[in-house]
Regions:
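N-terminal metal-binding scaffold of metallo-dependent hydrolase/deaminase domains
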Residues: 9, 55-57, 61-109, 442, ...
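Acidic, glycine-enriched loop/beta-strand segments at the rims
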Residues: 82-93, 384-388, 438-443, 451-488
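Hydrophobic faces of well-ordered beta-strands that scaffold small-molecule active sites
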Residues: 127-129, 159-161, 187-189, 232-234, ...
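Divalent-metal coordination cores built from histidine and acidic residues
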Residues: 131, 136-233, 319, 328
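Divalent metal-binding pocket/active-site signature
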Residues: 223-279
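C-terminal cap of metal-dependent C-N hydrolases
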Residues: 388, 395-402, 407-408, 423, ...
Length: 521
């Protein structure tokens, strides 16, 4: 005997029902065919033990372990629910079922898992719109999670890599690996212009692209967008040979797909205004939304007030323009990048000693002129931190209504800038707890704003039907613990993190590290 049971897009096929009807089949049935995915684009059948079907079957995460067929219910009780997208700020209970938010309730219904959030804040899982994804190991054929784990520990449940024009591997391959293996958090990508430019055959960052290379680049960008990338990212500061024409011919594919253009603009400090104008002019020409990447490190040298006023004027004229910022007054990049080309000391009004080495035999040391030039020649990929930004400019950016929080996290085997492990709790403890920002605005900058910018309607909110990606934190204890000496040290005060309704972090400890999946535009 076979029983069919529909659940939205999924059709479950159960066998051996007669032997089990004495019990609740939702709790005990073993599926012969796990499911038929009746989504808009595909029909996928997955059988127990059949290796011929691809690993990615569109399964909701709650169906991927020994609880197949069981309706999982989680109750988060007595917490302060903060959901800016729904204008909710109240003490209540939150019910989760089958990986989705079922709603708020004053009751305490029975549940498989009950989390007591008394005295804590319950918010949507944080969304990081600007980070740099983990590397790919070609020998093992898998991703090497490092920064994704740090993200999870600080409450990030969804992040976007591929920023500043950089991908670590083909976007198509990366998303396939996330589908196959999962990861600590949900991951989406931007198509990195610089990466794809090199794949198209042009590796000289100081020269213009040739017409045949532009054709190959255009094809690669189109393929990446069709595969689900959320838009195109540019790192023009790192590739000064890129012309405005190349940017237009690359970004134009976002127009037909309705995607985002995120840009590490061409210049910073006193030249940042013309650089932002370039992004805006392209956005207007193509009618595309723009995102100014890490505004703190672009105008955080005394130009921030004027830069934010410029952004306001563009927005008032109808341009969809926003930005992101991390709550630190030091930026990070590799020592061989164009950021450190001749003239940088004068541009930042600084000295070589402002540069701190993040890895290798000189880790923790400040640069001298000799060491700087030695590493530029012999180890150009060495990660550095440059302590040159003005704290007051960073604070000004973070308080602006069009600027959302992002980590710009970049790590190499746990080494790098502490923002990759501390940016989100740092905003809570150093801005909210310190009275510089209200809680709702901070949570919005960490969840609703980036989710809305990306078009992720089921992320960044706790409304009914949303994905149950949730972070529960203690405002009395929340603090970032990552330092420049120990950049991957996890924060305190993050009590639980749920992804798809399942507990990924409990009392600061990672319990499940593969609940995340690829997300696509």
């Amino acid at each position: 005997m076979v029983l069919f049971g529909a659940d939205g897009r999924y059709l479950f096929v159960w066998a051996d029902v007669e032997a089990r009807m004495k019990k609740n089949y939702n709790m005990h049935c073993m599926p012969m065919v796990v499911l038929l995915n009746l989504g808009e684009d595909a029909l996928v059948v997955r059988r127990q033990g059949y290796e011929g079907v691809p690993q990615n079957t569109g399964l909701p995460e709650w169906l991927t372990d020994g609880e197949r067929g069981k309706v999982m219910r989680t109750l988060i009780k007595h917490g302060l629910i903060v959901d800016p997208a729904s204008h909710v700020h109240s003490k209540n209970n939150l019910l989760v079922e089958d990986g989705r938010i079922q709603g708020l309730t004053a009751e305490e219904p029975e549940a498989d898992v009950i989390l007591d959030a008394e005295g804590m804040v319950v918010s949507p899982g944080f969304v990081d719109i600007h980070m740099h994804e983990d590397p790919y190991d070609p020998e093992e054929g898998r991703l090497i999670p490092s920064i994704m784990t740090s993200m999870l520990r600080m409450g990030v449940t969804t992040a976007i890599g591929g920023n500043c024009g950089i991908n670590t591997v083909s976007p198509l391959r990366y998303l396939e690996l996330m589908d196959r293996d999962g990861g600590p958090i949900n991951m989406g990508l931007l198509a990195g212009h610089t990466f794809l430019r090199e794949q198209a055959g042009h590796r000289d960052k100081y020269s213009a692209i040739r017409p045949d290379e532009q054709q190959r680049l255009s094809r690669l960008v189109k393929e990446a967008l069709e595969a689900g990338c959320f838009g195109v990212s540019f790192g023009i500061r790192y590739v000064p040979g890129v012309t405005r024409d190349e940017m237009v011919k690359t970004a134009c594919f976002c127009q037909s797909h309705g995607r985002l253009v995120a840009t590490h603009v061409r210049d910073d400090a006193d030249n940042v205004f013309d650089a932002v104008e370039e992004l805006v002019s392209i956005g207007r020409q193509l009618d595309l939304p723009g995102q100014v990447s890490h505004v703190g490190s672009m105008g955080g040298f005394g130009q921030m007030e004027r830069l934010l006023a410029l952004i306001d004027r563009y927005r008032a004229s109808g341009m969809e323009l926003s930005g992101d910022c991390y709550p630190y007054d030091a930026f990070s990049t590799r020592i061989g990048e164009t950021t450190y080309d001749e003239g940088f000391l004068e541009r930042y009004c600084t000295q070589y000693s402002a540069i701190e080495i993040c890895e290798g035999m000189y880790k923790g040391q400040r640069c001298t002129e000799r060491l700087f030039h030695e590493l530029r020649q012999t180890a150009p990929d060495t990660l550095t931190v440059c302590h040159v930004m003005k704290a007051e400019d960073v604070a000004l950016a973070l308080s602006h209504p069009a600027i959302m929080l992002a980590s710009d996290g970049l790590m190499d085997r746990g080494q790098g800038h502490p923002r990759g492990a501390g940016a989100f709790p740092r905003l809570l403890c150093r801005y909210v707890a310190a009275g510089k920002m209200n809680l709702d605005d901070a949570v919005a900058k960490m969840s609703a704003m980036p989710a809305q910018k990306l078009g992720l309607t089921r992320k960044g909110t706790l409304r009914k039907g949303a994905d149950a990606d949730i972070v529960i934190f203690d405002m009395d204890r929340i603090r970032d613990c990552a330092t420049f000496e120990h950049p991957d040290r996890p924060p305190e005060g993050i009590e639980w993190v749920l992804i798809g309704g399942k507990i990924a972090v409990e009392h600061g400890t990672v319990k499940q590290s593969s609940l995340g999946r690829a997300i696509r535009a």
